């Protein structure tokens, strides 16, 4: 599966409450595979994934960050890796890797 195909699957199967921008980038801090930012004033979620990673790791980082994006309506949960995030991660994983 290509990275862009995974983004399209997630957009259709696990849509976010805001517009989303997904970028493969070389501009992340060292040892950071991905990040998810929320700009409420623009109603925009920006997901960045490290371009230098192998494809399978890029997909895992995308799934991880998309799960954070699913919690955009819950500010106390958005940056956590708690039970709510775990459920979102599982849903995203199943969308990208259906059994």
Identify the residue ranges that each predicted region occupies.
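Zn2+-dependent metallopeptidase catalytic core
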Residues: 1-19
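Catalytic zinc-binding patch centered on the HExxH motif and its immediate surroundings
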Residues: 17, 23-44
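Residue-level signal for threonine
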Residues: 25, 48, 82
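Short, solvent-exposed loop/turn segments at secondary-structure junctions
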Residues: 27-29, 52-53, 67, 76
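Short pre-active-site segment immediately N-terminal to the catalytic Zn-binding motif
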Residues: 43-62, 76
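Active-site recognition of the HExxH zinc-binding catalytic motif
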Residues: 60-72
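Post-HExxH zinc-binding segment in Zn-dependent metallohydrolases
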Residues: 74-99
């Amino acid at each position: 599966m290509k990275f862009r195909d995974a983004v399209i699957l997630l957009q259709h199967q696990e849509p976010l409450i805001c517009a989303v921008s997904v970028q493969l980038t070389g501009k992340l801090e060292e040892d950071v595979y991905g990040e998810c930012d929320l700009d409420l004033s623009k109603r925009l979620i920006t997901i960045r994934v490290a371009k230098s990673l192998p494809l399978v790791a890029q997909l895992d980082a995308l799934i991880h960050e998309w799960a954070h994006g699913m919690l955009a309506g819950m500010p106390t949960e958005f940056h956590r890796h708690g039970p709510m995030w775990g459920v979102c991660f599982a849903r995203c994983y199943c969308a990208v890797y259906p059994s």
